[in-house]
UniProtKB/Swiss-Prot annotation:
Organism: Frog virus 3 (isolate Goorha)
Superkingdom: Viruses
Region (Disordered): 46-81
Biased composition (Basic residues): 51-73
Descriptive protein name: Uncharacterized protein 046L
Length: 81
């Protein structure tokens, strides 16, 4: 009885416990890592140029350009976006 129970638990439980984490581990890791990397990469790339463009426009427009050109840029930027 004991030998059968032990063998049954070891054979029945170990493969189940071993298979479930192994199957869920890489599957969830791949599913989570892929969308996270894809989502984070474009967000970082999109945000960095936008911030740089805004900062350059804000710095250059008031110093080098007149307020009339500022208004035109403000109107064009939201239209493009």
């Amino acid at each position: 009885m004991y030998s059968v129970r032990n063998s049954g638990c070891s054979v029945g439980c170990s493969p189940r416990q071993g298979a479930s984490p192994i199957m869920f581990g890489p599957s969830l890791g791949a599913m989570l890592s892929a969308p996270v990397v894809r989502a984070s990469a474009p967000v970082v790339r999109a945000s960095s140029p936008v911030v740089k463009r805004k900062s350059l426009v804000k710095r250059k427009s008031p110093v080098k350009r007149s307020p009339l050109k500022k208004r035109s840029q403000m109107r064009t930027s939201p239209c493009e976006a």
